[in-house]
Design a protein with these regions (language model features):
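Transmembrane alpha-helical segments in integral membrane proteins
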Residues: 63-76, 154-158, 162-163, 270-288
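A helix-boundary/kink motif common to multi-pass secondary transporters
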Residues: 17, 77, 90, 161-162
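Aromatic- and glycine-rich beta-strand/loop motifs that create alpha-glucan
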Residues: 1-25
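Secretory targeting signals
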Residues: 18, 22-71, 96-170, 178, ...
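Transmembrane helix boundary and interhelical loop/hinge segments in multi-pass membrane proteins
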Residues: 68-87, 91
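Alpha-helical transmembrane segments of multi-pass membrane transporters/translocases
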Residues: 2, 208, 214, 235-291
């Protein structure tokens, strides 16, 4: 296992995809800080480092999908996977070593974003207003979603020997997860009552409209189901973390139901998804015929 990990990390260090992902993460975070700084006078609500710090979270699934499918795809196409098995390594060891390397790579991309955002954001926008323990908690939750996303995409990549097919499948899956996570989150944000407003009558007079029950507001068992899905999906958690602080800033202007961060529930869901995806993928890979 240690030999597999050493070989995997050496290959990761030489991987163009890995370094391009790191560079893209650094440039993207730097660009966002620069844009927010340039808009401080006209759009100050977007210049808060508390919000900018988490903008990476909804995109980490796509970063993870691209790296995993290409990194593992090369192992399939070059015959590296078969060679590992031919020299006596077990399929379980091969699978878990690849998971460890891919998870470490994706976490490195994530923390590159965080480091660049802090290094540029603090001098330009000021220090975050939230406490250090809260930042560390959110970073830990975000890291767990990155690991669970890696486990999901690794399952697809390890079981798809064709590199092109693996890339298409992983990227489409990442987009589907983003759409699903956004759908469940947005559905939970619907307010229980509609906002009050004014109506113009036919005679030109104005009439005040009282708040009405919102037909799209979820309640009862269906709301519990949506909450569970938003927590189970890595993208659902990532959107919750990302929107938490911007939503608080806009709460005086818009009416919505804020989906709050539930640390223990979110962490447990990420761990369960990771364990289930890795165990399922390893069990199937153990019986797969590698061509």
């Amino acid at each position: 296992m240690r030999e597999l990990l050493r070989a995997g990390f050496r290959r990761m260090g030489k991987s163009i995809v890995f370094w391009l992902s790191m560079a893209a993460s650094a440039l993207w975070s730097g660009a966002i800080v620069a844009i927010r700084y340039s808009e401080l006078e006209t759009r100050p609500q977007y210049g808060d480092l508390d919000y900018i710090l988490w903008e990476f979270t909804p995109m980490m699934g796509i970063f993870a999908a691209v790296f995993v499918c290409l990194f593992i795809g090369v192992e399939h196409s070059d015959g590296t996977m078969r060679n590992k098995l031919a020299v006596g390594h077990s399929r379980w060891a091969v699978y878990f070593s690849n998971f460890t390397v891919c998870a470490a790579a994706n976490l490195a991309v994530m923390f590159t974003w965080v480091a660049v955002t802090f290094c540029l954001g603090v001098p330009l926008l000021g220090a975050p207003k939230i406490s250090a323990p809260e930042i560390l908690l959110n970073l830990a939750l975000a890291a767990l979603t990155v690991v669970s996303s890696t486990a999901i995409f690794l399952l697809v990549a390890m079981l798809t020997t064709n590199k092109a097919a693996s890339a298409v499948a992983c990227i489409l899956l990442s987009l589907a997860l983003v759409i699903a996570g956004s759908y469940f989150y947005q559905s939970l944000q619907e307010p229980e009552m509609t906002s009050p407003g004014m109506m113009v009558n036919s005679d030109g007079s104005m009439e005040w409209i009282d708040p009405q029950p919102n037909p799209r507001y979820l309640e009862g068992p269906i709301r519990k189901v949506y909450e569970v899905m938003a927590m189970v999906l890595p993208t659902g958690q990532q959107i919750i973390i990302n929107d938490q602080y911007l939503a608080q800033r806009w709460s005086d202007f818009f009416s919505f139901t804020l989906v709050t961060i539930q640390p223990w529930t979110m962490a447990l869901c990420s761990v369960l998804v990771t364990v289930l995806a890795v165990w399922t993928g390893a069990a199937i890979f153990r019986r797969k015929d590698l061509k």
